[in-house]
Amino acid sequence: MSAGSFSAFAVAQCVAYSGSNVNDQDYVQWSDTVKSYLTVCDNGNYMRVQSGAIEGKLLVEYYSSDFEPLSTKLIDNELPIFGAFYDSGNNYYVLSGQENPKQNDSLEVFRITKYDKNWNKIKSCGLYGANTTVPFDAGSARMTHSGDHLLVRTCHEMYKSSDGNNHQSNVTIEVDMPSMTITDSYTGIMNVDYGYVSHSFNQFIKTDGNHIVALDHGDAHPRSAVLVKYNSDFTTGKFFPNYFEQVSNIDVVTYPEYTAGHYNYTGAAIGGFDVSSSSYIVAQSTVDLDYINTSETRNVYVSAVSKDLSTNKLNKITSYAEGTDSASAPQLVKINNNSFLLLWARDTKVNCVKLNADGTVNGSIHTFEGSLSDCQPVIKNGRAVWYVYDKNN
């Protein structure tokens, strides 16, 4: 990339771990939990956290600022299913879960575990029963925090309903970080006016002031990339709205009915969600939704929603011809409140371009050989850094 712009680097190391994360940010129908994380340590080195590389363990590796391997830690899994990792700046948090096929209200199905920066376990808290048979089913899990409040947005397969089916929806949890107590959660059935989305195939969560702002990939109720802004003040320890403060919501992109196969298919993959100085930014790749039953090539789109949810501007970033290679689900990297880096993979190349606060393109698209992964890139010294690994390479 040209001088003065952000450089993008993928780092490869020849280490024999099982699995691969190549292009794992991408999906066809529903997403999966993010299993690859990279953070910048206080001393300027890098720490990567990888789930699934070693059975029963969370792999933690440290690298120098020049990407030289330094040391490795193996952290025992808490509950059997990994959900997410989060670095709050002062502590690490790991979300895990376990299946509950017998619908046992006394079984812990979600657990949030707090560690110090040396990976010493401090304390954990959890939800029991919670209308959950399979945590993280057909979706993802992400965490954020503001002040002493840790916020979780994920999903689950629910207890069998009156129609005899186990449906899937999103889940939201709030944790008081100093005491590690869950102060609020919602795992029931409601409607989008209360932040409920079903099915929810991908989940994102941010804060804006004292309000939660979340994004879900819905296929039915509603069938859209739906942005939800809670009018409640989560700093009270409670986020779930009452009748008089229902959430504000907007269908960022509505997905037409799909009649050529199962209705779960929406022709879209959401890759990024963030908050700019003026807008809520949503990045995704979709087929030509006007021809959802026949279109196969996906292009990248960025939506900018005003903070009062009154306006919604769709910016088309790519124009790949139908029948050619698709763009993957993109990665959206925040540089500052007015600037973002958008990356997507296509064939054997990575493409990237800078965005303004309103989601419009700032400059030219740059292309280079490489791969993306489910590792959210981090910004350090003007560089976007992520990692890719593959047991076969």
Predicted regions and their residues:
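Extracellular, repeat-based ectodomains that mediate carbohydrate processing or recognition
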Residues: 11-393
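Sec-dependent signal peptide cleavage junction
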Residues: 4-12
